[in-house]
């Protein structure tokens, strides 16, 4: 079991069957990550070599459908390209939001952990959010990222999907290599100031830092 946005997030290791989701939902789980660094019994991962991109397995499709019906938001961060596309399509069947809790735009940093523009737009269309990750390799093609690279990602995403669909997904607990200015949570104020100085409206900054993610979480939950 992982922890993201409090205790609202669980990795697939804690969920063995679609039926078990009922128990997790009753305990407050609101976000499900079907896959992590490597492929598993549910889906292929962005960490796998391209030939291994088989997408969702039948069990994975069943779990995503069950999560969507229960109001549990599915997270496509770490999912392979095919798996992410299939998750978005399945969630759309139930009108459920999808999130990328800690992924960036591949257009700015060509890394398999980042998402392509079509998937980013689909997340926004679902009503979900994309959380900007602070890991240097996901921010820029350069070895070491700067605060300006984070600002660039945020602005790109705001322009692409709209200010209501961008959030912060720093991934500090993920042993990342962040920009020096964002070595820990104390750097958030620096980022907020840098965004405003770059022309991002203050109300958009407030939405990106908290309101957008809270909106999605507050709308999640067990459905009748």
Language-model features and meaning:
Residues 28, 74, 102, 130, ...:
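Conserved, mostly hydrophobic/aromatic
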Residues 1-16, 49-54, 181:
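Active-site mouth loops of central-metabolism enzymes
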Residues 2-6, 37-39, 72, 77-84, ...:
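Active-site beta-loop-alpha junctions enriched in small/polar residues
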Residues 11-14, 77-78, 106-114, 140-143:
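Acidic-and-aromatic substrate-binding clefts and catalytic sites of carbohydrate-active enzymes
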Residues 183-224:
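Mid-to-C-terminal alpha-helical segments outside catalytic/metal-binding sites
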Residues 16-26, 47-73, 79-99, 112-126, ...:
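Histidine/acidic residue-rich metal-binding segments in metalloenzymes
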Residues 133-134, 161-185:
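Short acidic/histidine-rich active-site segments
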């Amino acid at each position: 079991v992982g922890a993201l946005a409090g205790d609202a997030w669980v990795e697939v290791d804690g969920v063995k069957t679609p039926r078990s989701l009922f128990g997790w939902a009753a305990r407050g789980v609101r976000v499900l990550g079907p896959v992590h660094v490597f492929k598993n019994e549910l889906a292929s991962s962005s960490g796998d070599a391209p030939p291994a991109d088989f997408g969702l397995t039948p069990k994975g499709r069943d779990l995503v459908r069950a999560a969507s019906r229960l109001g549990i938001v599915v997270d496509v961060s770490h999912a392979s390209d095919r798996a992410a596309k299939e998750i978005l399509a399945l969630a759309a069947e139930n009108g459920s939001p999808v999130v990328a809790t800690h992924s960036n735009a591949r257009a700015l940093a060509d890394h398999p952990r980042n998402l392509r523009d079509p998937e980013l737009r689909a997340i926004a269309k679902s009503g979900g959010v994309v959380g900007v990750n602070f890991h240097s390799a996901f921010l820029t093609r350069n070895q070491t990222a700067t605060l300006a690279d984070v600002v660039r990602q945020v602005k790109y995403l705001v322009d692409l999907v709209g200010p209501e669909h961008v959030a912060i997904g720093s991934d500090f607990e993920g042993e990342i290599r962040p920009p020096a200015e964002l070595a820990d949570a104390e750097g958030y104020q620096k980022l907020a100031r840098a965004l405003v100085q770059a022309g991002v409206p203050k109300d958009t900054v407030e939405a990106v830092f908290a309101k957008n993610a809270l909106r999605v979480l507050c709308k999640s939950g067990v459905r009748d």
